[in-house]
Amino acid sequence: MRALMRKTLVIGLLISASFVFGQATSGSQAAPAKPSTAAKVPVHTAVAAKPTAIIDTTVGKMTCTLFPDKAPIGVANFIGLATGTKEWKNPVGTTKHGVPLYDNTIFHRVIPEFMIQGGDPAGTGSGPDPVPQFKNEVSPDLLFDVPGRLAYANAGPNTNSSQFFITEVATLHLNGGYTIFGQCDEATVTLVKQITHMATDPRNDRPFRAVKILHITIVKGAGTAHPAGTAAKKPATAAPAKPAASSNQ
């Protein structure tokens, strides 16, 4: 009799233990995972700072941020010519090594409410191309919708070389036809406006008082020049549809 009672007690204890353990196990499986209390470390993506061109002229300094991400060929060409690290040929065909192309060149064409144009070693806008022509680089999200755009002049698609222009106002009619490779700051736009309102020869829009580029310094990793404003209040009705081409016009 005692053996039977002992056996019954043991079985009861085993059943109770199984029931309790089963509840605990079932509960732990159904419970949601506890959120981690470890602090999340933010991931920082490195963004390379854009180079800046500081253009010293006889009437003041211009500062323009370059866009190598939008126009890598154009920016590399401009930097190479500005610093003399790229070979080029002068108007008589002599190859230049280690000589900055833009030093002592003039802004040969300036038009009020439009732009100033330079970068031709011949100083006329129709000199021979100092470097081989290269293709346009046009980004759909980079437009002539603000003043101060720095872009290449051309004689049609894919004829960029050394000549460039800086806009005084928004020039939406140029969208899609020219390589924008930089943005100049507000002080530069003010200086551009001063230049475009100089007295010019009506035959070629060249200032009677020469505006010369003394030197261009490239500062790597500088700050970004912000657009000088929004679209112009009135269109540049006196300006031609496009900046003058280099050698083909």
Spans of model-derived segments:
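Bacterial N-terminal signal peptides that target proteins for export
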Residues: 1-11
